[in-house]
């Protein structure tokens, strides 16, 4: 509770709180995502940061934080998809464990761990496999919340274009979207068919709390193209 209070105070003091009058377009997007997924409206902030990112923090009263670069880089639909993804974390009650996973990801950086007292404890946690298991769970949680975003947007290409901008940065405007999707399918095919490719992909992703953007595109395409997405909609009468 104390930590959650600190998080809220930090962003109230250093970021812009989104309200019906302050950034009303973002507030409207949050309303759409929350109403669709059946989640009580959390507080949302926009923080000055050049990294295209967003995250959800807190537990009992979670907050969503959008980096300013994300709001500037993405169009309205893509921004809604990101907000829906974050609301998906709240709906699925991921926030506590995601916070722990991000902390472990941070501490796994050797240069950071060397500066922190008790780094031997960090090494012990890692050796016990706790870190690997939690980060693996976090990556699956991210994929499940991409599906939450899909349920809000009902258009896999909005998710795909968002991932393209995450992968390509400012260069994304020069990237052919259809070829990017083809790359995602090729990645998934190689991952499924080649043990060596699967090994290297898993090794490279093992220390991260998020799957690679291409991986996320491949997963959302598979979910929609195999009919699983339609089954979820039908089950909920959509």
Functional labels for PLM-detected ranges:
Residues 1-57, 131-134, 170-171, 193-201, ...:
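Hydrophobic or amphipathic, alpha-helical segments that drive membrane association/targeting
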Residues 1-8, 147, 151, 155-238:
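Cytosolic-facing loops and C-terminal tails of multi-pass membrane proteins
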Residues 14, 21-27, 33-39, 116-190:
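Short helix/loop segments within enzyme catalytic domains
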């Amino acid at each position: 509770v104390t930590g959650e209070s600190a998080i809220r105070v930090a962003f109230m003091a250093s970021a812009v709180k989104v309200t019906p009058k302050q950034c009303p377009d973002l507030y409207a997007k949050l309303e759409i995502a929350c109403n669709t997924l059946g989640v009580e409206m959390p507080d949302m902030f926009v923080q000055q940061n050049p990294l295209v990112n967003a995250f959800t923090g807190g537990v009992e009263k979670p907050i969503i934080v959008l980096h300013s670069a994300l709001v500037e880089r993405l169009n309205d639909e893509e921004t809604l998809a990101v907000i829906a993804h974050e609301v998906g974390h709240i709906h699925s009650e991921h926030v506590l464990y995601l916070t722990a996973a991000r902390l472990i990801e941070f501490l796994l950086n050797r240069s950071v761990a060397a500066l922190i007292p008790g780094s031997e404890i960090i090494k012990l946690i890692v050796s016990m496999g706790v870190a690997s298991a939690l980060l693996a769970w976090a990556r699956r949680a991210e994929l499940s919340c991409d599906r939450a975003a899909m349920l809000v947007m009902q258009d896999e290409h909005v998710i795909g274009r968002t991932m393209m901008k995450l992968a390509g940065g400012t260069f994304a405007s020069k990237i052919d979207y259809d070829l990017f999707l083809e790359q995602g399918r090729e990645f998934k095919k190689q991952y499924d068919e080649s043990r060596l490719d699967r090994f290297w992909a898993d090794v490279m992703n093992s220390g991260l709390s998020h799957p690679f953007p291409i991986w996320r595109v491949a997963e959302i395409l598979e979910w929609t193209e195999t009919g699983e997405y339609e089954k979820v909609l039908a089950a909920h009468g959509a």
